[in-house]
Amino acid sequence: MRLRKALLLFVFTLFTLSNALGMTEDEAKSAIQEYFQSGHPEKAINLANQFKEKSPELKRLAFIAAVKAANTQYAGRFLPFKNPDAELNFYIGRYYEEMGNLTKAMDFYTSFQGDNMFAAPCYYQAGRCAERKDDFIKAEIYYDLALAAERTYKPAYAALARVKEQLGKKEEAEKVARGNYSTMARGEKNFAPPQVKPLKTLPANFKGKKSGQIVRACLAEKITSFNLTVNKTGEVFNINYEKGAILVYKQGKLIKGTTSPYRISNKDGIIKLTDIRTKSGPSGSLPTGSMFRGDLEIRIKDKALMLINHIDLEEYLYGVLPSEMFTEWHYEALKAQAVAARSYILLKMQSSTTAEYDVYVGKNTAYRGYNREKPQTTAAVDETFGIALFTPLGSPIDALFCTNSGGYTSSPATAWGSQNQGFLAPVPDKKVKANTTAPSPGQMAEFIKSPPPMYCYVAPYASYPSYRWCVQYSREELENLVDPQHTIGYIKGVQVNSRDISGRVTSFTVQGTLGVIVIGSRDIRAKLGGLKSSMFVCEYQLARNGLPNTFLFIGGGWGHGVGLCQTGAAGMAVSGIKFRDILKHYYPEAIIKDKCY
C-alpha cells in the first residue's frame, strides 16, 4: 500500500512538473489560487515547488499551501520569512498553532501593521490561542480588536461573549451575544467621513425652490398618542387614538374627533413631534423630537395611528440626502447622489402600490426630516433642482446605489434575481479595465487580494473594511449557517459554480458527506452569515484527516453593488470629475434631463 501511494505521488509530481515547465510565473500563481479555492493545496505545493527557488512569491505560496494541507513538517522548511505581510502572518500563526506553540502563534497573528483584509481573522485566532491558554483578559482584548477591525465578523461576537462570561461580565456578555456591542479597543472603522468642523442646521424659514410635486412619506404606524408643535404659531396639540377615533386636544380641550384622515397644515414652517407613544411603548421607530417640513396627515390603521408627511419633493430631498451620504463629502458626489435620490422618488411616486403613501421611512427611504438637514446637502439639492435620470422610454430610473462596489458594480439579476436594466448594467471602477467574460478563480483572487488603484478606495471616503474584508468560519460554524437541520452531513468541500461579469458569485455549492446544497445569487450573502457582498473567493484549510476544518471568505465591496458606488463617486469627485460624468458612468444608458417638472 505504501509503495502504491508513493508511486502515485511520484507520477502526480511528474505530471505537475511537465505542466509547470510550460507555465509563466503569473500563470502558476493563478493556478495555485485556483487550487486554494478548489480544496487541493497539495497540488498547489507541487506547482509552487517548481518556482520557489526563483520567485519569493511562489515560495510564499508554497508555504501557505503546506499549511492549508496540514503538512506542518514541509511548511517548517520555509521559515523564517523576511517582512511577512498580513496574509503570511496569518498562516505562520496557523503553523505555530498547529505545532502547539500558542505564544508564538499569537505573536505572528498580532504583528502586522496597518489596515488589511486579514486583520479580523488574525485577531480572532489570537483570541482563540489566548482562550486555550486560559488567558481570558488577553482573549477579550483580541476578540474586541477583531470586531474593531470588522464589525460584521460574527464568530467574534460569540467568542467575546464567552470570555466575558468567564471574566464575570455577565451584562456585557449578554449584550455581545445579541450583537449589541460597541467595540472600545480601536473604535468603529467601517466608515470614515472626513473630520471637519460641524455646521449649523439651516433656519426653519430657509426657502429653496419648490417642485410642486408632493411626496407622501409614511413616518410611522402603531402610534397611540403624541404631541405636535407648530413652530410658526407656537401651537401645541395632543393627539390620541381612543375608541376607534382620532382625538385632537389643544390646551387640554378637545377640538376635533374624527374617524376620517385628519391633516394639520404647515405652510413654510416646521412641525415637531414629541412624547410619542406606540402600542409597544415609547417612540418606536420614530424618535421623539423629530421635526418635519410640510403637512402631517393622521390616519387610523389597525386600531392605532399612521403618520404621513406631505412634503414638496425638493424639501423631501433636503431630509433624504444627509441620511444617504456623509454631508462633508465632496460637493460633486453630493450632487450626483441628489440626482439619484430625485430619480428614485419620482419613480416611487409613479409606481406607488398603496393609496396612503409613496414611501415608508426605514423600509424604502432614508428620509429623516428637518433634523438631518445640513447646508452642504441642501445646497446640492438646490443646485441640481429638477435634474433627474430617465430611461429612453421616458420613465424615471430606479437609481439604486451601494456603499462600496469593490471595484465593479453588479446587476439586479445577480442581487435579487430580477430583470436586468441597461441603466443598471455592471460597470468597472473608472480606473479598472472592463471584463469581457466572468473572471476565473485565479483572476478573481488577484483582483481581491492585490487590487489595482481604484476610485472606490480613496481616503478618507472609504474605510478598508468596506473595500476589502475576510471572514473565517470553522467547518461546524459553516454547517450551522447553511444547513442548520444537518441534512447533508459533514461539509467536505465548497465550490463556486458561476460568477457574473463583475466577479460576484451567482451560484455556490456546499458538498456534504450525505448530500449537496446549491445556493443561488439572491440567498448567498444571507446564507453565508451576512457577507458584506457576493464578490468573494472561498479558500479552505484541511485538517490532518483530509477534511476541511476552516473556510476563509475573502471579498470586496459592501452592499448589493448595484448602481452608483458612493465611495467611488466620492473618489471620482475629489479627482475633479463632475457629477454628470459620475452619473453617466454608473448609470450607463440613463438620460439626464435638466427639467423633470
Task: Please describe what each predicted stretch is.
Residues 9-16:
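Bacterial N-terminal signal peptides
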Residues 1-8:
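Bacterial N-terminal signal peptides that target proteins for export
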Residues 21-49, 53-58, 64-86, 92-110, ...:
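Conserved, single-site charged/polar hotspot
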